Every structure is written in C-alpha cells, then in structure tokens.
C-alpha cells in the first residue's frame, strides 16, 4: 500500500490569512473584556470552528449586527472578523463606518484578496448599459457578497446547462444592446468555467471575460484529477458546506470510482487497502493537522488489516490433518488453499 497527500491540500492563502488574523485577535483579547466575534463561520470546517470557540471566539449572524454596533457605541470593546468569503456590501459598509467613529470597535476584514478582486470587477463592470454575469452558487456567501457589489442588471448562473436554457435571453435585443461582463466564483470548477465561456462566446461575441477562479483552486483541481487517474482509492477531506471541497469530490470520482468524502477521522472508510494506491486531498478550509490525522489513521487501519490477516493464517505441522479448498487443477498439479502461511 502507498498513501500520498496532495501537495495543494489544506488551507489556501485566503483562508490561512483569515484564521491567522482571527487567532491573533483572540490572543490579544485574552484576559481583557474585549469580545471577539466572527460574522458567520470563519471557515467551512467544524473541527476548526470548535477549536476557535474554545479560544473564546463567538459566531454572530447578519441579523446581530445592529445590536453589536449599538453595544460598541455604548462603550463595549468588540472585535468583528469578516471571513474569507467576504460579506454583503451594506453590512461591510456599516461595520467600516462603526470602526471609523468608534475606537472601542475593531473590524478585521478577512476577505480573501482574490474574492476582493471579483468584488471590484462586479462594481466596475455593472450599472447603466451593462449586464453582469457570475458563474457560481447563488446561495454561497462569497457569491452573495460579490453580487451585492454589482449595480443594475445582474445574474448568477450555476453551469453551462443553465446558459443553454437561457439562450433566447442571451440573444435578446436587451442583452445585445448592452455590455456583458462575465466572472466566476473563485472556487468554481475550472472545466465548467471553460465550457460556460465557450458557450457565451458563441452567442455573444463582445462579452468581457474575467478569469477569476483563483490559481490555487486551479492547481488543486488539476492535481486532484491527476491523482484520481493514478489511484485505486481517493480520500477527499472537507465540509459538505464547502464549495471547493465538493468540487474536488466530483472531480475525483469522475476518474476514481472508490472515492470517499470525509469530514474527519471518524469518517475514514474501514477498507482493506493492502496493495492499493491511496491518495488524499482536502478542501481549502481543511487544517493540515486534520489531513495528517487522516493519513495516520489510514496507515494504522492498514497495519491492523495486515495483523488480522497474519493471525488468521494457520501454521501446519507434520502429521496434521486439515481441510482445504481446491483453487485450480492442471494436468501436472492441483492447487489447494489450506489457509496457512506456507503452501
């Protein structure tokens, strides 16, 4: 058995940047009256969420913001951390405004620089005479934040098929009379993006195309695809709420039928991987410590299988009478499986 860990598995730059800032804020607040809040889950990983909760982080929702700002204006020392996905423009604006006027309130904007770039594109390429299209999951926090930065006519599409269904609209006088700009959620499937762009170019030749899938996502997906083609078993670690993790799972199982999606070591498949090639990859919100735990667990399971096999084999002594199973017969010999260490 061989187990490989993908070189691009685990925290990406944007996630690492956000969690580093959160942990620094928690360290600074230790022993003080300052409260540290994350606006939503800082990352899509339940193991890490429990870790930062133990350090004092508390999770709030958008609906809590008015009360948080009110408390800060009354003198409470408060820090709010925006996650790597970014936040709705109106929410961010109100938090920045509070931070500017109130020294007791600290805002840590952990929005990933790649996500910020897409938000800028949405703002600069929307409004009068323009239509903004975004490839992504409309319910994803990153997409919600990006679309809140776009003015006027704007649409989210999940895949090329949805564009085909909207072909009549794309060919309409309304679309043709306006400048069409197209971007993507930073963690989108690269293959789906290429198909979508090719389709748009066929029906709308003057579209402005912005390639906004982050390069780490591209490398992670390409490596996952290559490993899946070479592996007997693929393990994808992540959270089912994580867009990039689920896309890795979809990519892996295209080429490797024995692909398992797990969130932690408790989900590790109990399978015999003796003589098999196993590869492990993980989403951008997966701590490397968890990847190492899964690697260790898979190795230990394989050792246990080997020990069980060894203990199940009998040792024969001269004069023993045993039962066996004939496995093959040829003109010159008969093969019998005696369930022993030697034949």
Model region roles, listed by residue range:
Residues 1-299:
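The feature marks the mature, well-folded catalytic cores of soluble enzymes
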Residues 300-343:
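Single-stranded RNA-binding regions, centering on S1/OB-family and related RNA-binding modules
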């Amino acid at each position: 058995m061989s187990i490989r860990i993908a070189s691009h598995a685990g925290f990406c730059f944007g996630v690492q940047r956000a969690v580093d800032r959160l942990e620094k804020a928690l360290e600074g607040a230790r022993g003080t009256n300052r409260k540290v809040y994350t606006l939503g889950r800082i990352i899509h990983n339940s193991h890490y969420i429990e870790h930062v909760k133990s350090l004092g982080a508390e999770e709030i929702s958008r609906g809590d913001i008015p009360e948080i700002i009110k408390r800060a204006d009354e003198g409470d020392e408060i820090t709010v951390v925006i996650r790597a996905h970014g936040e709705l423009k109106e929410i961010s604006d109100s938090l920045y405004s509070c931070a500017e006027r109130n020294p007791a309130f600290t805002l840590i904007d952990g929005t990933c620089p790649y996500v910020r770039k897409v938000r800028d594109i949405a703002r600069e390429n929307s409004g009068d005479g323009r239509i903004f299209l975004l490839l992504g999951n409309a319910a994803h926090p990153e997409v919600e934040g990006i679309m809140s930065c776009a003015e006027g006519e704007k649409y989210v599409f999940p895949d090329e098929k949805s564009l085909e269904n909207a072909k009549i609209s794309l060919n309409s006088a309304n679309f043709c009379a306006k400048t069409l700009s197209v971007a993507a959620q930073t963690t989108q499937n690269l293959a789906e993006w290429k198909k979508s762009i090719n389709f748009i170019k066929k029906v709308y030749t003057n579209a402005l195309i912005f390639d906004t899938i982050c390069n780490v996502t591209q490398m992670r997906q390409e490596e996952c695809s290559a490993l899946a083609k070479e592996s007997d078993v693929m393990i994808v670690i992540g959270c089912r709420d994580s867009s990039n993790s689920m896309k890795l799972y979809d990519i892996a199982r295209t080429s490797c039928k024995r692909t398992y999606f797990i969130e932690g070591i408790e989900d590790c498949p109990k399978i015999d991987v003796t003589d098999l090639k196993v590869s492990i990859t993980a989403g951008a919100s997966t701590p490397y410590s968890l990847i190492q735990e899964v690697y260790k667990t898979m190795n230990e399971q394989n050792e246990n299988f080997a020990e069980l096999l060894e203990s199940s084999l009998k040792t024969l002594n001269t004069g023993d009478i045993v039962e066996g199973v004939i496995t093959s017969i040829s003109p010159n010999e008969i093969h019998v499986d005696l369930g022993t260490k030697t034949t």
